[in-house]
A protein has these predicted regions:
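Post-cleavage N-terminal segment of exported redox proteins
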Residues: 1-38, 99-103, 121-177, 225-229, ...
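Soluble non-cytosolic domains of exported or imported proteins
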Residues: 34-37, 46, 86, 117-121, ...
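Sequence/structural segment immediately N-terminal to covalent heme-attachment motifs in c-type
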Residues: 36-62, 67-69, 157-162, 170, ...
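C-type cytochrome heme c attachment motif
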Residues: 45-58, 91-97, 124-128, 184-196, ...
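Proline-centered turn/helix-capping motifs that create local helix->coil transitions or kinks
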Residues: 56-61, 138, 228-232
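Gly/Gly-Pro-rich "capping" loops immediately C-terminal to redox-active cysteine motifs
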Residues: 58-93, 106-119, 145-156, 195-221, ...
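Substrate-binding/catalytic groove segments of enzymes
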Residues: 102-106, 192-193, 200-202, 228-234
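A cross-kingdom marker for long, charged
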Residues: 217-218, 230-264
Length: 264
């Protein structure tokens, strides 16, 4: 029995290493540098909406440990303030939207497959804001995947983001169309937890078909305060709404509501 367990563990480890070490070649995409104060302020807002600031990477984007567990190992969200000064704009773009690090390996855990849809204008503003921030001295460390996380990598439950790119960046042709603006926001933000089809994930976030049951007042309360009808807390969604979606504009909340109410 111990031999079988050892062989299975060895197979998982070796198989995961092949995936982790796979080299990917990013498309070269040049973004414009942003220095305009209004654009930088918009970049700060979007960095919060999309989870870069005050969420995954910490309140000052200083990086943090996402989880640490004997079987799962250790997953880290890196220090963005240092990465923004270390890498070029094309390298940062490849990490964010293509899921490819400068060394050619894929990122895991970061929602690049969702961020892939972000427009050049939005991503330029976000990166401009991050690059303007003082470098934080925090060193969260490196990923150290445990057996269960490696099993998820091998089975595709935790996919290499470089291998699951399903879309190109949106062009700036949708802002005046309320439903299309809502679709864009859902694609870049909501899909990070609810899946690219917004149908939810097993054991995780539910299908957003639930939004058909919300009226506008209830939806605004969900986005701004993370509270479901009856003032019910929704755990991670409540935390996410307060840290991220509370920074959506009224126009964006309305657009998201229209899109989610009409999608089938």
């Amino acid at each position: 029995m111990l031999t079988i367990v050892w062989l299975a563990s060895a197979w998982i480890y070796l198989s995961s290493m092949r995936i982790l070490d796979t080299q990917h070649v990013p498309d070269l995409r040049n973004l414009s540098s942003v220095t305009d104060p209004e654009r930088l302020a918009e970049g700060e807002r979007l960095a919060r909406v999309y989870g870069c600031a005050d969420a995954c990477h910490g309140d000052r984007m200083q990086g943090q440990v996402i989880y640490s567990h004997p079987l799962n190992g250790r997953m880290v969200a890196p220090n963005l303030t240092q990465a923004a000064q270390q890498y070029t704009l094309p390298e940062l773009e490849a990490i964010a939207r293509q899921g490819i690090r400068p060394d050619g390996t894929s990122v895991f855990g970061m929602p690049s497959s969702s961020l892939a849809a972000m427009t050049d204008r939005d991503l330029s503003a976000v990166l401009g804001f991050i690059r303007e921030q003082p470098a934080q001295v925090n060193v969260p460390g490196e990923n150290d995947y445990g057996l269960l996380t490696r099993y998820r990598i091998v089975t595709g439950a935790l996919p290499a983001q470089a291998a699951v790119q399903v879309q190109q960046p949106w062009r700036e042709t949708f802002r005046d169309n309320e439903a299309r603006l809502g679709e864009y926001l859902a694609t870049v933000a909501c899909s990070q937890c609810h899946g690219m089809d917004l149908e939810g994930r097993p054991g995780g976030a539910p299908s957003l078909d639930k939004m058909h049951d919300y009226d506008r007042f209830e939806f605004v309360a969900l986005m701004e305060r993370g509270m479901a009808p009856g003032e019910r807390s929704l755990g991670l969604m409540t935390e996410t709404a307060r840290k991220r979606f509370a920074h959506l504009t009224e126009e964006e909340v309305d657009a998201l509501y229209v899109y989610l109410k009409t999608r089938r």
